[in-house]
């Protein structure tokens, strides 16, 4: 019996129990019963049928690698989605009890009212009015089939409501204008009637100046106060000249009292002189007479040994008398005035 070299992926032709260890070659690999069959795509030059038959030969009836369950037996595993959705769904599947629906019918929706299947005339009390104007096939001609003239007369509405029948081919009718071809419409209503043709040459020369906006003063002759909603001066004067009783007032407004205390004070004329008392005191000045009264005070107590004039010493019993000015002496104010004018003031001393 010849032996062929085998790869690790190739199955063995002989079992280790039946082969002789002494006769095996050193380069051969001993296979066991747990060796997996070689896949069909990894064997070059072999067909799928030969591989399947070879697998059946290697795996016996008692091999642990053989599948003992049928193809329909899935065991404890659940069916996949592709196996469930193979069948087509019908109307009966909508009524299957699948438990509580998630987030379904959480809010209550009120049916809209009124429902179109109800009698609206009976619901709103319009049955009598509908019976009056309903068209019933009783062989009689309804007077209101073309116009509501009789009903309008019954209501007492003033005016004429006679319908005027017009010709269907009248070019002034809206239906004729809508069905007019585009070429005919342009020839009759567009061409030669552009809006720019309605403006004269004089108007075209002024329109650019009229629509140009720029800053500037408006002449008084062209100014109109009514544009801004202001009260004109003439109407304001007429309003002021009216007596208070003739002026319109708001409701619940108390009337003005026409007593002497409420009379309006008229503005004084420029030549009018008021008899109010005026101030006679002159303003402060710096002339020769502005220093009067500065030297008419008490003398200083610096040279006295009896104390101050506030009550200490022998002079505490009374106030000092004002010292009378002697003819041969000169007052302090005059001496100060003469000494403040330079050498011209002291030249006479």
UniProtKB/Swiss-Prot annotation:
Alphabetical list of Pfam families matching this protein: Rox3
Biased composition range(s): Basic and acidic residues: 70-81
GO cellular-component term (any): mediator complex
GO biological process, one term: regulation of transcription by RNA polymerase II
Listed InterPro entries: Mediator_Med19_fun
Localization in the cell: Nucleus
Keywords per UniProt: Activator, Nucleus, Transcription, Transcription regulation
GO MF, any single term: transcription coregulator activity
Main location: nucleus
Region described as Disordered: 1-81, 238-349
Compositionally biased region (Polar residues): 29-53
Segments of skewed composition (Low complexity): 1-28, 330-341
Function, in words: Component of the Mediator complex, a coactivator involved in the regulated transcription of nearly all RNA polymerase II-dependent genes. Mediator functions as a bridge to convey information from gene-specific regulatory proteins to the basal RNA polymerase II transcription machinery. Mediator is recruited to promoters by direct interactions with regulatory proteins and serves as a scaffold for the assembly of a functional preinitiation complex with RNA polymerase II and the general transcription factors.
Similarity field: Belongs to the Mediator complex subunit 19 family.
Quaternary structure note: Component of the Mediator complex.
Protein name: Mediator of RNA polymerase II transcription subunit 19
Species this chain originates from: Neurospora crassa (strain ATCC 24698 / 74-OR23-1A / CBS 708.71 / DSM 1257 / FGSC 987)
Gene: rox3
């Amino acid at each position: 019996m010849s032996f062929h070299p085998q790869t690790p992926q190739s199955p063995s032709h002989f079992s280790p129990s039946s082969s002789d260890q002494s006769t095996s070659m050193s380069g051969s690999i001993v296979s066991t019963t747990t060796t997996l069959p070689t896949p069909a795509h990894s064997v070059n030059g072999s067909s799928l049928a030969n591989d399947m038959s070879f697998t059946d030969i290697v795996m016996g009836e008692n091999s642990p690698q053989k599948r003992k369950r049928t193809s329909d037996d899935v065991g404890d595993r659940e069916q996949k989605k592709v196996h469930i959705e193979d069948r087509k769904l019908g109307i009966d599947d909508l009524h299957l009890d699948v438990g509580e629906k998630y987030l379904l019918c959480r809010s209550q929706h009120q049916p809209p009212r009124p429902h179109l299947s109800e009698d609206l005339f009976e619901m709103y009390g319009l049955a009598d009015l509908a019976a009056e104007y309903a068209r019933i096939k009783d062989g009689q001609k309804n007077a209101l089939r073309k116009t509501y003239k009789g009903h309008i007369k019954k209501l007492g509405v003033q005016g004429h409501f006679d319908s005027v029948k017009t010709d269907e081919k009248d070019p002034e009718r809206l239906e004729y204008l809508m069905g007019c071809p585009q070429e005919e419409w342009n020839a009759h209503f567009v061409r030669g009637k552009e809006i720019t043709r309605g403006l004269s040459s004089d108007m075209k020369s002024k329109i650019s100046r009229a629509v140009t906006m720029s800053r500037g003063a408006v002449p008084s002759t062209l100014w109109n106060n009514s544009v801004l909603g202001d009260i004109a001066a003439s109407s304001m004067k007429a309003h002021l000249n009216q007596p208070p009783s003739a002026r319109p007032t708001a409701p619940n407004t108390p009337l003005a009292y026409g007593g002497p205390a409420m009379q309006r004070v008229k503005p004084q004329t420029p030549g009018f002189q008021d008899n109010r008392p005026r101030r006679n005191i002159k303003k402060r000045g710096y002339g020769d007479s502005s220093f009067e009264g500065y030297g008419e005070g008490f003398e200083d107590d610096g040279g006295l040994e009896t104390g101050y004039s506030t009550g200490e010493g022998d002079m505490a019993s009374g106030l000092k008398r004002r010292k009378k000015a002697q003819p041969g002496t000169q007052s302090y104010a005059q001496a100060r005035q003469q000494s403040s004018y330079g050498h011209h003031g002291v030249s006479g001393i």
